[in-house]
């Protein structure tokens, strides 16, 4: 229903993805290569096909019903006026009864009742089973939603449908930290497992509770830049990225986070549109601009997460009809745009900018049929630019985005720079210069300047005396460039970057 986020069996591999034997082989082969495998952990909700929920439906007053949130309706209406993340009411009527069950996502994804201790213990047993197999950790999905306000109060409607966003109920709940600590102590902590939380709706003052030495997780994703294009009502009124706000937001997050620990830095993921289309101005949506965006992201303080296709510069697809989409959220946003008075063309354009399916089109391996992804029919169509943007072509081109990413990551992890880029401070620079994204990475031994021109005009940068040599620049991406720099200023053309020591 939701591309794998509706779990019907927590102890099995979905048939379309392979077998448990193949997964065990993956773990073994990864270990030989000193690599680690983490998996998605979806424990806010399960599938309506799960054995627990099927038993709950048969007896809405029985033991398994308490694994979920079954509530009586009010005056013939649902228990409260929450809108699910995918649109429509959060409450689904149980046929033949006066009860409803809660689903903050799709109706096929009933929320699990984390107030039930027996359920929690079953989840902990399942998590430890995977860790015992040799898994190194988890990306933990939608985890802050596990704590509900059990009064389920109504909120002021925020749209024409008379409903209120369900996250308002989550924000009104208290005590999620206690549940997360119990989760950690019963599972991850025992195995020294790596965890990265997908956390929205966290209060800023709660950051030290979520990351750092004693945090609930090893790290959490930094979604601060993604939130800049959140519309008040949906995708149809999502604002375009403003460079000054983007720069201020990212650097501000860096300064706040370093007080407590590390965040996981992203440009894109499976729930977001492609970063090259979202964050780069039109004049920079090219290989040079994509390398520039990758540079300023990968060299930030924190853990860089590189999503499939990002390393070759994949972009948003061109969608001709709402029927071409598979994503449930996209179809809901299309309906919301139409309901708000937009034309079909305008609604489709809004989805084209923001749809999650932009990041879910098949990986572009080659210029062969289906971009070399499969000989079968893929879930989604292939981006029509696959003949120009694909792995096979970029493998052969030393100046490609792919080979640049390899060089960038290798330098970040090199013996010379790994301490600096792991633990060094991030200090904003040239914040008053139009179009310039710049910062220093600094520790007791080294100081590196990263500077990029996102503008459409050349910019003059006045350098301080600490800049001695250029390590990498737009013009020098094939070899390690270690040449002396003796000039007091730097002339940076549009869509260019430098990395200086």
Give the predicted meaning of each segment:
Residues 122-129, 133, 292, 296, ...:
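A non-catalytic, amphipathic alpha-helix used as a structural packing/dimerization or gating element
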């Amino acid at each position: 229903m939701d591309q794998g986020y509706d779990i019907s069996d927590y102890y099995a591999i979905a048939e379309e993805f392979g077998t448990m034997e193949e997964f065990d082989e993956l773990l073994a082969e990864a270990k030989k290569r000193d690599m680690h495998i983490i998996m998605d952990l979806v424990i806010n909700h399960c599938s309506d096909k799960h054995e627990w929920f099927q038993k709950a439906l048969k007896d809405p007053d029985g033991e398994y019903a308490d694994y979920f949130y079954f509530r009586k309706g009010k005056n013939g209406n649902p228990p409260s006026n929450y809108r699910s993340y995918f649109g429509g009411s959060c409450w689904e009527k149980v046929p033949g009864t006066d009860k409803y069950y809660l689903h903050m996502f799709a109706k096929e994804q009933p929320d699990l009742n984390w107030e039930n201790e027996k359920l929690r213990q079953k989840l902990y047993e399942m998590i430890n089973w995977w860790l015992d197999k040799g898994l190194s950790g988890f990306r933990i999905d939608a985890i802050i939603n596990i704590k509900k306000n059990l009064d389920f109060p109504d909120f002021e409607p925020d749209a024409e449908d008379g409903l209120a966003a369900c996250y308002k109920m989550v924000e009104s709940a208290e005590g999620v930290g206690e549940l997360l600590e119990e989760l950690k102590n019963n599972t991850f902590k025992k195995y020294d497992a790596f965890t990265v939380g997908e956390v929205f709706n966290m209060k800023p003052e709660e950051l030290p509770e979520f990351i750092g030495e004693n945090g609930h997780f090893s790290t959490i994703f930094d979604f601060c830049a993604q939130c800049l294009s959140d519309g008040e009502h949906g995708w149809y009124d999502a604002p375009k990225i403003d460079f000054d706000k983007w720069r201020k937001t990212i650097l501000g997050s860096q300064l706040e986070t370093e007080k407590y620990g590390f965040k996981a830095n992203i440009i894109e993921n499976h729930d977001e549109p492609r970063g090259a289309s979202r964050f780069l101005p039109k004049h920079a949506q090219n290989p040079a601009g994509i390398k520039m965006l990758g540079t300023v992201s990968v060299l930030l303080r924190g853990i860089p997460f590189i999503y499939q296709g990002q390393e070759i510069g994949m972009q948003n697809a061109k969608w001709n009809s709402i029927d071409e989409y598979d994503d449930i959220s996209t179809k809901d946003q299309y309906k919301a745009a139409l309901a708000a008075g937009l034309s079909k063309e305008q609604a489709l354009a809004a989805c084209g900018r923001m749809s999650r399916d932009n990041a879910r089109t098949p990986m572009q391996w080659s210029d062969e049929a289906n971009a070399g992804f499969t000989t079968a029919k893929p879930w989604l169509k292939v981006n029509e630019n696959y003949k120009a943007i694909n792995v096979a072509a970029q493998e052969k081109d030393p100046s490609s985005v792919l080979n640049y990413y390899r060089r960038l990551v290798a330098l970040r992890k090199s013996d010379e720079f790994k301490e600096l880029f792991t633990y060094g401070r991030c200090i904003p620079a040239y914040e008053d210069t139009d179009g310039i994204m710049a910062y220093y990475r600094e520790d007791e031994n080294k100081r590196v300047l990263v500077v990029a021109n996102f503008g459409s005009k050349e910019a003059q940068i006045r350098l301080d005396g600490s800049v001695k040599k250029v390590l990498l620049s737009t013009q020098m991406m094939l070899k390690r460039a270690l040449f002396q720099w003796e000039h007091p200023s730097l002339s940076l053309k549009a869509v260019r970057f430098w990395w200086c020591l």
